[in-house]
From Swiss-Prot:
This is DNA primase small subunit PriS. The lineage of its organism: Archaea, Methanobacteriati, Methanobacteriota, Stenosarchaea group, Halobacteria. The keyword DNA damage does not apply. PANTHER family: DNA PRIMASE SMALL SUBUNIT. One of its GO terms (cellular component) is DNA-directed RNA polymerase complex. It is an enzyme of class 2 (transferase).
Amino acid sequence: MEERTRAYLRGRFGDHYRQASVTPPPAANEREWGFIPWTEGPGETMVRHRSLLDLGEIEDFLGRRKPRHVYFSAGRYDEPSASTMSDKGWRSSDLVFDLDADHLPSVVLGEDSYAEMLAKCKDALRRLLDFLEDDFGFDDLTIVFSGGRGYHVHVRDERIRHLERDARREVVDYVRGIGLEFDELVDEESVAGTAGRSSPAQKRTLSTEGGWSARAHRHMLAVVDDLLAMEEADALEQLQEYDGIGEGKATAALNAARSNYEQLEAGNIDVHPAFYQLAKILLHEVVAADNAPIDEPVTTDTNRLIRLPGSLHGGSGLEVQRIDRDDLDAFDPLVDPVPETFRGHDITVEVTDGGLVELDGDSFTLEAGNQTVPEHVGVFLMARGRAEKGKE
């Protein structure tokens, strides 16, 4: 990044911060703070181990220092400005989740556009919220667009604030479906008669109420619905695509599903041994489709620094923005986080990496060279290293 570009961005970030209202997190004075300034050279240098007392009022600090990135800790401490973690005196930590489009299995880097990556990340966010709200029963959630390629979720429920790393890793494993075994999801009870199996009879069911068991049940029923809507030959052919399912088992599983649909709806998967085997195989699809691929180190690290909502992301010029739960569906990460400071006027930039830019409801295909663009587009390009500031 050239000095002209760096000075321009730093100045405009400062203009934004002098007008912005930034709300600090709860217990802000108990947290460590860090920031990355606009420094020369290709790398970035983190300034950390600061307390709010060191920084002063957060809005004054932002307007004065005009930082490139701003962070606060998930952890709360006795001495947040101590230079070593052992001297800080850990009290508790928020449970923080990070979804980054770069790490999603569904994202094809180099092929998916920025908009497509963010759309896939929003789908993953919905799955994460399903786990947090329905499975864990958390309602004190703060949802944040990171300003870059993903989302953060902060849980500040008193019940989890004192969890240590191993317990937090169990939460990670649960939402990612790591180590999930089908037999753990199945309720088994002895019943009179054969229950579709040879005696002694055991009735094995998937819960329809919640958790991974209910997800497995919903997916199983969706597959059954698709199979029953097909021509029989097509359904049998599809069933035989699963490992271990030959023609005989495919026929038996399909007939059992057709004859016992109401039992399947109720969760009974013991309608036939072949169908039980199919249900077990489908678990792999359930985990792939329904897990939340969060960044594990962020959640397990009780000392993690995370972006400050209301600050600007120095790699995009977009605002790190809180999202009300009820507004999530309507939230557009390419429109809503565009700062008002950068709207309404054009600037000149020297584009070095042309291509598509989708921002603030518009789409631009830019070639390399001098270009006059809306300022929010120019800031985005410069922050991402795709342009330098041109002469006006």
